[in-house]
Regions:
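C-terminal structural cap/anchor segments
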Residues: 294-379, 384-390, 394
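Outer-membrane beta-barrel translocator/channel fold
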Residues: 91, 173-197, 201-203, 249-330, ...
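Outer membrane beta-barrel
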Residues: 70-102, 109-190, 212-216, 220, ...
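Residues on the lipid-exposed face of transmembrane beta-strands in outer-membrane beta-barrel proteins
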Residues: 40, 66-72, 122-126, 160-164, ...
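Repeated loop/turn-to-beta-strand initiation elements of outer-membrane beta-barrel proteins
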Residues: 77-80, 130-134, 169-173, 181, ...
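Residues that define the transmembrane beta-barrel architecture of outer-membrane proteins
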Residues: 34, 60-66, 116-120, 154-158, ...
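Beta-barrel outer-membrane channel/assembly domains of diderm bacteria
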Residues: 2, 9, 20-140, 387-394, ...
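Transmembrane beta-strand segments that form the barrel wall of outer-membrane beta-barrel proteins
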Residues: 44-46, 133-147, 172-174, 210, ...
Length: 436
């Protein structure tokens, strides 16, 4: 598989920050074999989605996934060589005719889920001067390209990536990918977006990105990223988060996230000029925390991101709705509690309520986001209520096994025609196992 790597301004800027010469990393002395790890991750997932207005109202799927990830250490020397490899398999436990469609399993004819799907891949890697380079199948998580991990198996991307950590607290990264393997498929495909009515001919040939992440100041995190989805958009992201401890019991946490998205090249999805931001303020007192958030989309197209991915780092992105329609305003209240305060460590819960409003008569009709337009959508409103309960075993043979129960209720008025009324229940059991 060949990759046409183009040195865009993003990569020139990233390369300029990497030292030309530095002492070789001490951790490469671990060796190719001595520094190797093998981790297994088993996930059992059950999804029940009841969309009130859909042709298939009661969608139910249940599956078992397994992921094996091997990561070698590095050979000795100024430049160390290493190898990563992974294998995944997903098995259908339930999802018969007429009930498929929750997206944890691949779809087949007659609304039946396939019985099994699997994939394997790997990446070569080099490390030197505090810089790591990888080429092959990548697990990525950042604000402009993040593999989806909310289903049974994780999403991966095929391409190259480089990471530099020369300065304590500062991480620089960049890369370019040309294909993705979605979380419910075996094979790779070109990259498309989540909310557009995109045809295969409009898929992008590649995505390039570069960014910086700062965590070197106590209580402060900040990120700046830029990405080019070829012939679709340029997307820029920035965030700032600060945790201020008032005393040993109480802390305050304000934060802000901002995206700017602009069409580029052939503009395959049409004209895009979108600014989307969210702010949050959390008060934590002991084992309790309360969060208030506000989110706003400025633009006649929705805020969009990579299909089936998680690169929406916004406060009001919920289990069912992202509250990201054209020109939408939304707010959220959330309460979290850690039951360690009652002598039950490992048990936690979260309850949130979100509400949004948009004028969909102003949504663009001349782009691939035309489905959001509604001539009667001047007063489009919707809300979502989410309730999560999670338990992580603290000791014994089941240590680190977690059970997550999630329930969401979503309702919209007739003016919000692009989204369903929905009741959704999920059960996710994760068991990570470190072999060596």
């Amino acid at each position: 598989m060949s990759f046409a790597f183009r040195f865009t301004p993003l990569f020139v800027a990233l390369a300029a920050t990497i030292p030309v010469a530095a002492q070789a990393d001490e951790d490469k002395a671990d060796g190719f074999i001595e520094g190797s790890t093998l981790n297994l991750h088993f996930r059992n997932a059950y999804f029940n989605r009841n969309e009130k207005n859909a042709s298939i109202k009661d969608k139910r799927e249940w599956g078992q996934g397994a992921v094996a990830r091997f990561e070698s250490g590095y050979t000795p020397g100024v430049i160390g060589f290493g190898l990563d490899a992974h294998a995944m398999v997903g098995l259908k436990l339930d999802g018969g005719g007429g009930r498929a469609g929750t997206s944890i399993l691949p779809s087949a004819p007659e609304d039946k889920a396939r019985h099994a799907f699997s994939t394997a891949g790997g990446a070569i890697k080099l490390k030197g001067f505090d810089t790591e380079f990888k080429a092959g199948d990548l697990f990525l998580t950042n604000p402009v390209i993040a593999g989806g991990e909310s289903r049974m198996l994780p999403q991966t991307f095929r391409g190259v990536a480089v990471t530099n950590r020369s300065i304590d607290g500062l991480m620089l990264e960049g890369g370019k990918v040309s294909f993705t393997k979605p979380y419910n498929q075996s094979g790779h495909r070109r990259i498309n977006t989540y909310y557009s009515n995109q045809t295969p001919e409009q898929d992008s040939q590649n995505l390039s990105w570069a960014g910086a992440s700062w965590s070197g100041t106590e209580g402060v995190t900040a990120n700046v990223y830029a990405a080019e989805l070829k012939d679709i958009w340029n997307q820029y992201y920035a965030d700032f988060d600060y945790t201020y401890p008032i005393n040993d019991l109480v802390s305050l946490n304000p934060g802000v996230h901002f995206y700017h998205t602009q069409d580029t090249g052939q503009s395959k999805l049409g004209d895009i000029d979108n600014n989307t931001w969210s702010v949050h303020f959390t008060v934590a007192a002991g084992y309790h925390s309360v969060t208030a958030a506000y989110q706003r989309v400025n633009g006649d197209t929705p805020f969009d991101y990579i299909n089936l991915g998680d690169s929406i780092f916004l406060d009001n992105s919920r289990m069912y709705s992202d509250f990201n329609a054209p020109n939408e305003r939304s707010w959220k209240l959330q309460y979290d509690y850690d039951f360690a305060g009652l002598g039950m460590p490992g048990l936690s819960t979260s309850l949130s309520y979100s509400r949004g409003k948009a004028d969909l008569t102003k949504a663009s009709q001349d782009t691939q986001y035309y489905a959001f337009y509604n001539a009667d959508g001047e007063n489009a409103r919707h809300w979502e209520r989410d309730f999560d309960v999670k338990y992580v075993f603290q000791q014994g043979q089941l240590k680190d096994l977690s059970v997550l129960l999630r329930y969401a209720t979503h309702r919209a008025n007739a003016a919000y025609s692009d989204i369903q009324d929905n009741d959704e229940f999920r059960v996710i059991v994760d068991y990570p196992l470190n072999v060596f």
